């Protein structure tokens, strides 16, 4: 039997140009399984070593390149390797872990096309080239927020590395099969590419389309996050389908923190593999059954209606011009998914009692527009039906009105009280979640994971 070797895709370029972005996007579009290996793992010393006073990371002699070649060769030939990981958060090396080869090995770093031995191991060579102004902006953003550097340290590192970049990194460009360039444009950061062979065009076209789709996705997430009446804290989730695959926000993440590679997951249609961290939203199953684009929110004014005994009657009245379904309260996650799967496919709006709103459409822009319209109608209804003004000290809710107030009570107590106040002032009857409902929520593994992620996000917010 012929020995089938794995593909190695080498991605090279200066520091902070988007090599990791390209690597992670490739894992999403390649049909066969792919893993990313970071060239930074080859650094000889930890961050605090005095050796870095004499060398830069761009100097080949400061990296274990011969060991890199041996490990790449093993992965190419289906041999497991043990590899330590350079942790940029700590500046130290994490303990070595075993890595099993897959069909596509994406090797990204500073020296991946440095010499003939690397280039001979490589099946596709990619060089990432970025406008200097953009490169500095990206490097500042990454190193300040993720790697713990000061602004002064970042600029000093850029200055110190200039000569080594010209000597060791830039010459690799001429050996690449593909050159990808990021640059500023009127519509934001654009990605362009040049290739020596037409055989890569299909892959590059998918890569470019996914990058543009992710930019739109991030933009919508950030815009929704600014609508405080639609989502609060880590509530709500958004998704869009790309070539049948699902791009969805992560569990416990704040929409304002979603990025091209952060707080979102890519779920492959072929094998269900999930690319990205943290795990996808627990409502992923519902998103899969809905149309191309989905926005799930917890609009406060709408919740004041949905958390009342009169919810169904009012929803039928004020949203009679919409194609919608009303679902009585069911546990988030799998139970909601089962109901969504059975819905009337003509319905593009789902009202979930004591929970929130799903809007699905052909585009995220359309979803957002409909979501705003629905929230506006709820706001108008409450305004027109206000019966009394409650004393500020007397509107503490007598129970939990929606799931997030149960799972994350500390950060949602004020919202729960505000919803209760609006219900009473509108002459409606509050519908609290039962103790049984609350116990089920607190025992869901998906909710436990979300609590963990929310706690982690809170810690990060405090540090910054």
Q: What do the predicted segments below correspond to?
A:
Residues 15:
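The conserved Walker
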Residues 35, 44-90, 104:
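Conserved nucleotide-sensing/catalytic segment adjacent to the nucleotide-binding pocket
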Residues 94-145:
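ATP-dependent NMP and nucleoside kinases share a basic, alpha-helical "lid"
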Residues 19:
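Conserved lysine of the Walker
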Residues 1-3, 100, 163-208:
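NTP-dependent small-molecule kinase module
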Residues 22, 26:
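Hydrophobic positions on the alpha1 helix immediately C-terminal to the Walker A/P-loop
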Residues 204-464:
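Glycine-rich flexible loops
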